[in-house]
Amino acid sequence: LHEQVGRVEHDKFSDFNKKTVDLIVSEARNLAVKEILPTQKAGDEQGCVFENGQVKVPESFHRAWELYREGEWLAMTDTPEYGGQGMPMTVGTAALEYMVGANPSFMLYSGMTHGAARLVESFGTDEQKHMYLENMFSGRWGGTMLLTEPEAGSDVGALTTTATPRGDGTYHIKGTKIFISGGENDLVENIVHPVLARIDGAPGGTAGISLFLVPKYRVNEDGTPGEFNHVECTGIEEKMGIHGNATATLALGEKGDCIGTLLGKENKGMREMFQMMNEARAFVGLQGLAVASASYMYALDYARNRIQGRHLLAGKDKEAQSVRIIEHPDVRRQLLTMKSMVEGMRSLIYYNAGCIDEAGTTDDPEEKKRFEALVEVLTPIVKGYVTDRSLEVCSHAVQVYGGYGYISEYPVEQLMRDSRIFMIYEGTNGIQAADLLGRKLSMHDGQAFAWYLSAMRNTVEEARGQTELADLSEKVGDAVTRLESLAEDLKERVKAGGVMNAFSFAHPFLEITGDVSVAWMLLWRAHVALPKLLKKTGTLEMPDVMEKAGKNKEAAFYAGQWKTAAFFINKMLP
């Protein structure tokens, strides 16, 4: 963990030493396991209840939310000026993974609130910051993101919600928004909605969209929630999964004055909202990782305890005893597939968080540009690839359980249902693939993707110096070269006018880029692990390593990194 978490050395993070980081992550795990995890199944079964325009979340959510608030977890990585704790993004990501894995629908209320608050922090006036930020970062008030309309889903430029000036600097907002996560709930005293709308007379398409802050309740002079602002919840969706999160339809200004204030500049709403969208995409990638990790751990535990069938080597010996299913080759294959994906994706997401930390602390403009570009390249991979693989991991978990995995009594059934939405919301994975191919390959005249490939090659060169990793390094290096050639080929197709042809390969390109990225991260993990393994065992000869790993937990962990990298690179890397 400490090889990636909290590594940025800067005065801003001077309080976050190893001991402090361990304490933070340990406390996050305790809250997740003891308080949030028990709400997962109850929240799924009870769901949200819509009645007379109000939504009641599952009863168990209230205690968990209060404890989450008391621990000041919502604003872990934010400025202390508005109630944040100022942690490195890597530390916050590690802590958040536990809680999201415990109950993704519960933590979605937090994720949306945080993203909305960050919009206010980035683009709000001093008055707006004073009015909203502390209440939102504390979790006393909630937040959402109002983009989607019945006829404007991925095509946001087709929205019809209007903003009419009222003559006092505020606007009358009118329109309908759908699929709003946490759009109405009884966890918080007020809900602050960032709303995309078009000011009367503004240009059509995305060029004429502005961003507004629209609270559920207007804010009194003393900062308390006041008069209802006519943000009417007209219903919530019945969904396949994430039942504990209210997916609302909201009618703004249909039955009375719905008043909003401009956030940022007129007609710049899409540019501003992209900040929240990119944060949300990273959060959804973390949801994918966390749920995949939970599925893997459940499947591993089940396979270690479920006794069924004789060992393959027992042949036709009718006297042979049945063994735990983890002894069966195909179960082991599935578990190794899950393990390699989860660990590779985890390191990729933590690497992305580290780039955010570096970009936010470096004084070198060129380094800042490079790290920000790496985050841009990583965003569609983290959102698109990770959530695709998350569903795959969940499917493997169900398969390991066999028939029991298909029954709601067991947790993997719910996790698979919950994970399906991750591939859809905050920009479908088809959009993520198009973004990677259409925007990120050409960003900074191709330099952004070149920096990404260079980071991979740096790891390959470092790992190549270890004899035990020479072969794996060669294979990853070859994959990086082939990925570079593929990217150049697709760019040339676009330049030659073959746009439709090139973009038909967008999703396979995302998948290949993700697989190479996971191989890169697993190679890095093995590179870090081998010296530690040698220190624990005194040898890197595999038979001796495995014997000693059976007696030493840490040695087993480090040996596992080596074996996992070898499995993925040899068996799964394209």
Regions found by a protein language model. Name each.
Residues 443, 459-574:
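C-terminal amphipathic alpha-helical interaction region
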Residues 170, 174-228:
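A short core secondary-structure module
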Residues 77-88, 105-107, 285-292, 388-407, ...:
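Conserved phosphate/anionic-ligand binding catalytic regions in large, soluble enzymes, centered on
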Residues 114, 125-128, 132, 428, ...:
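A structural-propensity feature for long, helix-poor, extended segments
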Residues 179, 218-234, 239, 246-280, ...:
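A glycine-rich, basic-preceded beta-loop-alpha segment at the flavin cofactor/substrate interface
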Residues 242, 351, 373-451, 567-574:
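Alpha-helix capping/hinge segments and adjacent helical runs
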Residues 48, 109-113, 124-166, 176, ...:
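Internal maturation/activation junctions in enzymes
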Residues 1-107, 127, 131, 357, ...:
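Amphipathic, small/basic residue-rich leader segments at the start of a protein or domain
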